[in-house]
């Protein structure tokens, strides 16, 4: 398949601003390339993919970042800045996707989900967060009712944040183990880095810490 990926509109890949989406995108690209798929990635200027993903074609877009929904109130309205990075990435992605099989959206935002109902090009979404916004939650419910196979989540507990999702498609976060060094020791602290949210599995991390003493 020819797949076009839309990156997060919050910082360029490699900046760290996009949080776990950066790792997820690179891991996903690695897996898809290994399966023989053709991959285009639409991302903010200055973005970099892992060297192992050099077969993917990277397209740069400029514009103003979106405000993260993690930093807004649950009932905040949708805002799109002038010279929107998200809108520019979607415009670029949709143009390339005219000759592709599917457009895969990695951003948790209103506009790409809304466009699923309004363009002929298939748009799929990996929802990376729990329910952070009333307006996005309601839109996902509306689009999911028509296109249930166009949404995937990272875990069952995360999908449970959306009560209308009965049989979620789960795409776990894969890790390229070559990028990590195994520490064969039980001494020293176990560090936890992550947002306090159900899908992060903080309870599991605490359980492991307790088991290790």
Where are these regions (language model features)?
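Catalytic cores of nucleotide-sugar-dependent glycosyltransferases that transfer UDP/GDP/TDP-activated
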Residues: 1-213
């Amino acid at each position: 398949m020819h797949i076009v990926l839309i990156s997060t509109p919050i910082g360029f890949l490699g900046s760290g601003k996009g949080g776990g989406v950066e790792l997820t995108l690179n891991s996903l690209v690695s897996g898809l390339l290994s399966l023989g798929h053709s991959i285009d990635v639409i991302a903010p200027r200055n973005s970099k993919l892992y060297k192992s993903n050099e077969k993917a074609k990277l397209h740069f877009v400029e514009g103003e970042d979106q405000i993260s929904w993690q930093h807004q109130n649950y009932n905040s309205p949708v805002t799109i800045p002038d010279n929107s990075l998200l809108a520019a990435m979607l415009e670029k992605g949709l143009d390339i996707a005219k000759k592709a099989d599917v457009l895969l959206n990695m951003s948790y935002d209103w506009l790409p989900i809304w466009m699923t109902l309004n363009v002929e090009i298939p748009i799929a979404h990996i929802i990376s967060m729990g329910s952070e916004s009333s307006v996005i939650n309601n839109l996902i419910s509306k689009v999911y009712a028509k296109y249930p196979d166009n949404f995937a989540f990272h875990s069952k507990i995360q999908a449970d944040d959306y009560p209308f999702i009965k049989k979620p498609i789960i795409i776990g976060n894969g890790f390229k183990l070559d990028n990590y060094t195994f520490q064969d020791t039980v001494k020293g602290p176990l560090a936890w880095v992550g947002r306090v949210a159900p899908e992060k599995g903080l309870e599991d991390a605490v359980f492991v810490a307790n088991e290790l003493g």
